[in-house]
Structure formats: C-alpha cells, structure tokens
C-alpha cells in the first residue's frame, strides 16, 4: 500500500484581520508535528476539512465579519503521492457593529421580557453566536408557554457605508401545543411509576419546555440508567399535539464488597457489604454489612 500521504502545507489566502498562523491554529488539520503520529491530523480528511472551514467561518462571524465568505478550497497532491497541499481562499469583508435590535411579530409574552433575552446589544461588534443564542432563548421562552414550534428569525439590514447592521427579530409562535401522552420504554427492571414520579410535565397539559427539560434531568439523576433520552414528536394528523417519549437504558445498581484483615489479637477478620440502590426496580435502597471482628460486629 505504501506510505500514507501527509499534509505538507496549508495556506489561507485573503486573511488580513488575523495572522495566518492564528487561523491555522484553529484548524484540526495541520502539518506533521510531534503529536500527529497519534492524532493523524496530518492526514487529509474531507470531513475534517469541512469542520475546519466551519470553524474559520464561525471565527470571523463571531467577530463582526458579517460578509465573510470562503471563496474556494483546493487540495492537491505531489507527483510522488507523498505530500498534500491545501489552499483556502477567503474574503473577510468589513467588520460590522450592531446599530439596533427590535422585536416584531406575535410575541404573546411581554416584550420587555423577550427583549431581556437578547444578548446582542447596539454598539457591540456583531456576533453570530450571540445572535443565535438570542433567538434560541426567545424560542425556548415561548416553548415554556406551550408554543413548541415557534419560529424566531433575525433579519439583518446592512448599512455598508457606516459598517453597521440593524436586526429585526421576527417572532411567529405558531399554534399552542399540549402533551397528549407520555410513553416510557427501555426500563426492563425499573418500574414505570419510579420514573413517572420524577416527571414535571404531565399528560393532557400544555407543553412546557422547562418542565420537560427538568423531567429528563430528574430521571437521569436517579442513577439507575446509562442513558436517558427524551423526545417530543408531533402526533400524526394533528397540529397541536405532541407525545413525550422517554427512553432509558438500565445499568447495574448493585454492589458487592469483600475484604479481609489481620491483627495480632483476632488473627484474620472478614468484612463484606452488599448494596442495591434500586431494589426489585422499586427505587428503594437497601444495604447489608457484615464483619467478623469481635470488637466491631456489624450486621
């Protein structure tokens, strides 16, 4: 098969706001180094390159470069098929600050409350991350009121002369949704009621995103499961109903501990303990400890 081709050089063409070396340090792909024998990051991977390009894009968009684009990428290999060369051509564009942010649409929650969730403020350098966090927070707040499928999008208006951007956050709550049924599966040992008593969302009640998240957290904290997944798929044929699907993967909850000791007065002593955190799937904890020591007998 021969030797695996290694990345000989990576070039980023068009970078001015940041040093090329700084941008290269953000990427997973790199030229051979003292750790690349283990990470294999000096071997070309289309998937890794796609991830690196997204990292570059996020780096610029989170620092004000709203019009940043990756124009092209070229990957070439040397005639002897030993060296790989990667060239990324970018256009940075201007750096934008935020001039204003306003809310529009059907809010259903006091506007002042939603405005407080906006993390991007006038006068600040534009950040895609902060903008996405803002729209997500508004969507989640509406979800707490039953609007599980709310659409919240930010429409930009650029002033290229002033290098400023104004955003209008458009809010469409959609229909209010309630939880039709709660289904639990995967609990081969733990009883249904042990899981259900941890739930904060109830059946036939309005969807509440916060209560649903708390429900998943509480089930996970029981400590009986390796995995806990919670999904809320729409009920087919309806526009205002979802089911809450909880899937768990059981894990061992019992422990057996054995030990032995030696002393001049008692020679050999034996200790043992058996604990079960989820007795017969009931959620009850039981433990038994035994010691043969004359000075300290425990049953």
Each language-model region and where it sits:
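Periplasmic polypeptide-binding modules associated with outer-membrane biogenesis and secretion
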Residues: 1-264, 273, 287-298
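Short conserved beta-strand segments at catalytic cores or DNA/RNA-binding microdomains
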Residues: 275-277
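Short loop/turn motifs that connect adjacent beta-strands in outer-membrane beta-barrel proteins
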Residues: 279-285
């Amino acid at each position: 098969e021969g030797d695996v081709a290694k990345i000989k050089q990576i070039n980023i063409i068009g970078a001015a706001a940041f040093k090329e070396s700084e941008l290269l340090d953000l990427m997973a792909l790199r030229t051979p180094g003292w750790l690349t024998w283990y990470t294999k990051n000096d071997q070309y991977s289309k998937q890794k390159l796609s991830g690196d390009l997204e990292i570059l894009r996020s780096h610029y968009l989170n620092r004000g470069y709203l019009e940043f684009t990756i124009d092209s990428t070229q990957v070439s290999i040397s005639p002897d098929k030993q060296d790989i060369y990667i060239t990324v051509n970018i256009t940075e564009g201007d750096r934008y600050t935020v001039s204003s942010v306003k809310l529009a649409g059907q809010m259903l929650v006091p506007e002042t409350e939603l405005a407080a969730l906006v993390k991007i403020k006038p006068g600040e350098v534009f950040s895609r991350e902060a903008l996405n966090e803002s729209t997500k927070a508004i969507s989640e707040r509406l979800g707490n009121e039953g609007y599980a499928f709310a659409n919240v999008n930010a429409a930009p208006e650029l002033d290229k002369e002033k290098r400023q951007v104004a955003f209008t956050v458009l809010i469409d709550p959609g229909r209010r949704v309630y939880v039709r049924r709660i289904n639990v599966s995967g609990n081969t040992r733990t009883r249904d009621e042990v899981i259900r008593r941890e739930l904060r969302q109830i059946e036939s009640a309005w969807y509440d995103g916060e209560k649903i998240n708390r429900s998943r957290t509480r089930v996970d904290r029981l400590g009986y499961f390796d995995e806990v997944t919670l999904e809320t798929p729409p009920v087919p044929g309806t526009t205002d109903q979802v089911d809450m699907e909880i899937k768990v993967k059981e894990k061992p909850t019992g422990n057996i501990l054995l030990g032995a000791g030696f002393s001049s007065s008692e020679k050999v002593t034996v200790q043992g303990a058996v604990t079960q955190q989820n007795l017969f799937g009931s959620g009850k904890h039981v433990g038994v400890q035994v010691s043969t020591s004359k000075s300290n007998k425990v049953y």
